[in-house]
Curated annotation (Swiss-Prot):
Pfam families: EF_assoc_1, EF_assoc_2, Ras. One of its GO terms (molecular function) is calcium ion binding. It comes from Homo sapiens. Ubiquitinated by PRKN in a PINK1-dependent manner, leading to its degradation. This is Mitochondrial Rho GTPase 2. It is found in: Mitochondrion outer membrane. It comes from the Eukaryota. One of its GO terms (cellular component) is mitochondrial outer membrane.
Length: 618
């Protein structure tokens, strides 16, 4: 909604434009009227809509055509004033003033217009019969108000309707010629209906209607008011009420009725409560509230976020089998402009016979939050988190402390850990990721797939952690400055092909050797005969030289579910990186031996000194 309103008064000379402004401000009819009133600003606290309002007068005698065009360009709404006792001023509305305001607008939004029939004190009847054909011809005309500056009749109402035309415009909502909601409005209201339909029975119960009413307007409907609403719908819409519940058709009809009766602010209140702008698009503030993620920090869903997305899951799991079928998932995504999760989903999380279980669903949310928190905020926005939870979705996100602090303290508080699986093409990275999801080669899709992610939970010292595996090619890391940052690096080589180890060794030296990221070399295809290195150190010798854990053999051959031991090891290394270095540093063994020798020597010296003291005392 706009933060201020600029109203421009136009019309023929002597129709009373200036008198209307002065009567509003002075609350009495002015005895002397200047050719043009100065621009006035009405403070927000004295206007019904609580928005500051600027009122601008126009005088054809004092202002040029260029100044007029500039004022029209700046105006949010134009009041075309005519004299109800002068037919000629009414005709000028059609032939002069409306073409001046919107004549150059062939496409896009037009400036809303309020017709103002002044000097009603000089005419006994109404001018509406003459004005109605003009209102029918020009859809940008919001309404017509007859008033009298002399008698102060309808002066406040005039400027209220002008404000309303800006803050609650009819044009984006309703097509007066077709007498129906515009498609964008119907689409937005349909999404709101689906979010409010908590049991997904395609209708709003009294409880759901009251929750909706309270969310939008601050108070529930009285029982009789609820019955009256349903009665009106029943009389006008076939199928608008089903089993005493309001259907989507009934909901859309009610909003159409509000607009037709001039209460379009009601529909706008609903739309804005659910995040819509004047253009009937979800606002940036609604979809992406401010959240600061400093360098070295990561983002995770907190308990509020997990509770919300789990409620959404349970809402759409209509058969209560603990998993979302493709149809149920499509229902969940119906409030999005497009499905947010693509065909890569089955390769990213655990699924069950084409269905998405709660565990895999929560894993996917965790992955999106970690990799792209802006997308996560947007997804929560489309699901109505800010409205349904009455707080912006940044409250559902935890920003972790800097990784540097984790390294200093020797442990991490993070629940989500990132492992980059690095290796040359063909070493089995994709198979490794799928093995993490419990799929052996017998259950995997052998078609070529782009590098991706896999996420699952792993137990680390009795705590559940989310481990993300990210597939990275060695060529990319060696040829570019691609970000190699992660919590643990899994350097994978083909144990049957000695050449593939050289790629991993180069990546280690280039990116990880001088850093604090724990690394684990993995020898894939362990079911095949081990290759013999032609020259250079063997993988085991390389790891000993660089104080790294010994290479771990791995194979996912066969239909059985692969072992999870290696994934637990990776997660533990990521959670406690200092333990890796402490246990493997050769100096620690040397130091232990040295301390043993020194300890024995100190004990001998102390014993000898004690002996001398005892001898002297005798």
């Amino acid at each position: 909604m706009r933060r201020d309103v600029r109203i421009l008064l136009l019309g023929e000379a002597q129709v009373g434009k200036t008198s209307l402004i002065l009567s509003l401000v002075g609350e009495e009819f002015p005895e002397e009227v200047p050719p043009r009133a100065e621009e006035i600003t009405i403070p927000a606290d004295v206007t019904p809509e609580k928005v500051p309002t600027h009122i601008v007068d126009y005088s054809e005698a004092e202002q040029t055509d260029e100044e007029l065009r500039e004022e029209i360009h700046k105006a949010n709404v134009v009041c075309v004033v005519y004299d109800v006792s002068e037919e000629a001023t009414i005709e000028k509305i059609r032939t002069k003033w409306i073409p001046l305001v919107n004549g150059g607008t062939t496409q896009g939004p037009r400036v809303p217009i309020i017709l103002v029939g002044n000097k009603s004190d000089l005419r006994s009847g109404s001018s509406m019969e003459a004005v109605l054909p003009i209102m029918s011809q020009f859809p940008e005309i919001e309404t017509c108000v007859e008033c009298s500056a002399k008698n102060l009749r309808n002066i406040s109402e005039l400027f209220y309707y002008a404000q309303k035309a800006v803050l609650h415009p009819t044009a984006p909502l309703y097509d007066p010629e077709a007498k129906q909601l515009r498609p964008a409005c119907a689409q937005a209201l349909t999404r709101i209906f689906r979010l409010s339909d908590q049991d997904l029975d395609q209708a709003l119960s009294d409880e759901e209607l009251n929750a909706f009413q309270k969310s939008c307007f601050g108070h529930p409907l009285a029982p009789q008011a609820l019955e009256d609403v349903k009665t009106v719908v029943c009389r006008n819409v076939a199928g608008g009420v089903r089993e005493d519940r309001l259907t989507l058709d009934g909901f859309l009809f009610l909003n159409t009725l509000f607009i037709q009766r001039g209460r379009h602010e009601t529909t706008w209140t609903i739309l804005r409560r659910f995040g819509y702008s004047d253009a009937l698009e979800l606002t940036a503030d609604y979809l992406s509230p401010l959240i600061h993620v400093p360098p070295g920090c990561s983002t995770e869903l907190n308990h509020l976020g997990y509770q919300f997305v789990q409620r959404v899951f349970e809402k759409h799991d209509q058969d209560r089998d603990g998993a979302l079928s493709p149809v149920e998932l499509q229902s969940l995504f119906s409030v999005f402009p497009a499905a947010p999760w693509g065909p890569e989903l089955p390769r990213t999380v655990r699924t069950e016979a084409g269905r998405l279980p709660l565990h895999g669903y929560l894993c996917q949310w965790t992955l999106v939050t970690y990799l792209d928190v802006r997308s996560c905020l947007g997804h929560l926005g489309y699901l109505g988190y800010p409205t349904l939870c009455e707080q912006d979705q940044a409250h559902a996100i935890t920003v972790t402390r800097e990784k540097r602090l984790d390294q200093e303290k020797g442990q991490t508080q993070r629940s989500v850990l990132l492992c980059k699986v690095v290796g040359a093409r063909g070493v089995g990275k994709s198979a490794f990721l799928q093995a993490f999801l419990g799929r052996g080669l017998g259950h995997q899709d052998t078609r070529e797939q782009p590098p991706g992610y896999a996420i699952d939970t792993v137990q680390v010292n009795g705590q559940e952690k989310y481990l993300i595996l990210c597939e990275v090619g060695t060529d990319g890391l060696l040829a570019t400055s691609l970000d190699a940052t992660c919590d643990v690096a899994c350097l994978m080589f083909d144990g049957s092909d000695p050449k593939s180890f050289a790629h991993c060794a180069s990546v280690y030296k280039h990116h990880y050797m001088d850093g604090q990221t724990p690394c684990l070399f993995v020898s894939s295809k362990a079911d095949l005969p081990e290759g013999v290195a032609v020259s250079g150190p063997s993988p085991a010798e390389f790891c000993r030289k660089h104080r790294l854990p010994a290479p771990v053999p791995f194979s996912c051959a066969g239909p059985a579910e692969p072992s999870t031991t290696i994934f637990t090891q990776l997660a533990t290394m990521a959670a406690f990186p200092h333990l890796v270095h402490a246990e493997l540093h050769p100096s620690s063994f040397w130091l232990r031996g040295l301390l043993g020798v020194v300890g024995a020597a100190v004990a001998a010296v102390l014993s000898f000194s004690l002996y001398r003291v005892l001898v002297k005392s005798q």
